Each structure stands twice: as structure tokens, then as C-alpha cells.
Amino acid sequence: MLAQFDVNLVVLLVLLICGLLSQNAAVTIAADVLIVIKITPLNQFFPYIQAHGLNLGILILTIGVLTPIASGKLSGESILKSFISFKSLVAIAIGLLVAWLGGRGVKLMSSQPDVVAGLLIGTVAGVALLRGVPVGPLIAAGLLSLFIGK
């Protein structure tokens, strides 16, 4: 009986419950999709998802961030003004820092997958307890890389 106990499935179920309790659609849907893939023949796609999922997610996120520029909601004038306002210049600097941290986070999560569970637990807890949003794992991993020197 113990040989058939799947700890990874239990972790996904716990994440699903946390997502539901915290009303976090992203965590809920992600856990749901991964559970379905795991318990069906679709599990043959896990190597592809592991190899390309993070990059695909970053691509979709980038499209979402750039959409206001493409749609015209963020005007060219507003973009140009961002280079002369102190507040906007600070925002640009922080954006650069966060992007750099995210890059470090991707590298750390790829090279040291043992930290992923802790980062996910912290992110889900932050969403559930602090009403945060689930953009934390990459930035958290980037910050962690500064502390552990990777």
C-alpha cells in the first residue's frame, strides 16, 4: 500500500486546496491541470512541460505586460514622459532590478530544483495569508540567489 502512495500527488492536492482557500485562481488552475496530467496518459508530456513551461509562462506574461502599449492604452506620449519624471525613473530602475532578480531566479530554480518547493510554499502562503499575488517565485528565487551566492 505504501508503495502506491504518491507524495507528489498529495503535494499537488494540498496546493489545490490552498489555492481554493486563498481564492487564487492561478494556483488552483495550475494544480488542477497538473493533477489531471499526472493521473492520465498526458503525463508523457511532463518532460516537455518541464523543459519549456517556464519560458512559455514568461512569454505569456510578457505579452500581457506589453498589451497596453500595443493596444494604445498606454500612449507614446506617456512612455516618453516616463523618462523625465523622477517617480517614473525610479520605477524604471526598480523594474530593471526586478527583471534582473527574476533572471537570477530562473537560473537558480533550474540549477537547484531543491529550492522550488520552499519558494512555492512561501509564495502560496504569501498569497493566502498576506493577500499577495503569485508572481513571487522568480523574484524570491532571485533574492535567494543573492543570499546563497549562486
From Swiss-Prot:
InterPro entries associated with the record: UPF0756_TM
Domain of life the protein comes from: Bacteria
Location of the protein in the cell: Cell membrane
Keywords: Cell membrane, Membrane, Transmembrane, Transmembrane helix
Chain segments annotated as transmembrane: 1-21, 45-65, 83-103, 115-135
Matching Pfam families: DUF441
Gene Ontology CC: plasma membrane
Membrane topology type: Multi-pass membrane protein
Family, per entry: Belongs to the UPF0756 family.
Protein name as it appears in the record: UPF0756 membrane protein ABAYE1440
Protein species of origin: Acinetobacter baumannii (strain AYE)
